[in-house]
Design a protein with these regions (language model features):
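The feature represents the first ordered module of a protein
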Residues: 2-78
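Short, compact, well-ordered microdomains
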Residues: 84-114
Length: 115
């Protein structure tokens, strides 16, 4: 059985210019693999994040990252699948999640809906 933690709220960080936490979900699956999704809305778009979101979607097992989508500063949108880094074209939050879940399934994992 999967253990889930979930929060959907504005960030506890107050003040102008701070990113607002929109979503933080973490699921520990029965095989001890972890799916974690964190999404923030930025106060304004940036050159690296023109869509105005900062995100990290992670799937790993026993300390090994199998799939990760993120857009750290200086790198922009990209994904890691089994150790290989590739550019990622961000279209929407919904598409980001669908693409991540597709890669999780392709690596032999389960997405959250099927956990």
């Amino acid at each position: 059985m999967a253990r889930r933690t979930r929060s959907r709220a504005a960030s506890s960080r107050k003040g102008a210019g701070k990113a607002a936490l929109l979503l933080h979900e973490k699921v520990v699956l029965s095989d001890e693999s972890i799916i974690e999704i964190v999404l923030w809305r930025l106060p304004r778009p940036t050159p690296d994040r023109p869509h105005g979101f900062k995100y990290r979607l992670y799937y790993g097992r026993r300390g090994v990252c199998l799939v990760r989508y993120d857009n750290e500063a200086g790198k922009g949108d990209h994904r890691h699948v089994r150790g290989r880094e590739m550019p990622y074209e961000f279209k929407s939050v919904e598409q980001l999640r669908r693409d991540f879940e597709r890669d999780v399934r392709a690596t032999g994992g389960k997405d959250e809906e099927n956990a």
